[in-house]
Amino acid sequence: QSRTGWQRPDGWERVLKSAEQYNLASEMVVHVTDGDGTLTSLLDDSAAMNRLVQAIGEEAQQYSGVNLDFEGLGFQDSGENLRQVQLKFTNFVDLLNQELKTNRSGLTLALHAPNSAYPGYDYQALGQIADRIIIMAYDYGSKPEPVNQVEQAVQMACSSVPAHKLLLGISAPSETAESIATKVGIAKRYNLGGVALWRLGVINEGMWQTLRANLIAER
């Protein structure tokens, strides 16, 4: 039972089977927020981390890999406290990656942008572990998302992680068919590995037309 509101949908097995038939990669999303201190408590408990890593590894065998979306780390932290938050999360990611690689499963991280209010993510260290990183360059406050801040986030990420490992996260509810083309243009300008869209079900036909005209789907 999900505590964050995102449930595994009915018929998910059929979706996975169809993805396999079309030679499409699939990822299991593991999503937790730290609003109530859940993540902080987890990262302070080595036994709990090991149990979670093992559970994720077992479940992930049905997928091509895992998309780890641990949100909210580092808010109001600074100095040594912030550094400890970053180290603990990096340690967890390293443990998870080791477990996943025993079954040749991939690891994607969905991270708050480097210029967000949540600095608890060491992009350089995480970029050396994960296969891909999604820069969640949204929730800056205004809509469409401000181009200057999105581009700044990409520049900051590229200074620490090879561009081909980075995907620009785009929140469809924050964009229009016109503005989403601008965001895709930023990803292209910096030679990123691609874009990641949040989420299916809220991307309108105008956006799809823009995406089809500007992107090549990779399986």
Say what each PLM segment does.
Residues 1-219:
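Secreted glycan hydrolases and related glycan-binding modules that recognize and/or cleave
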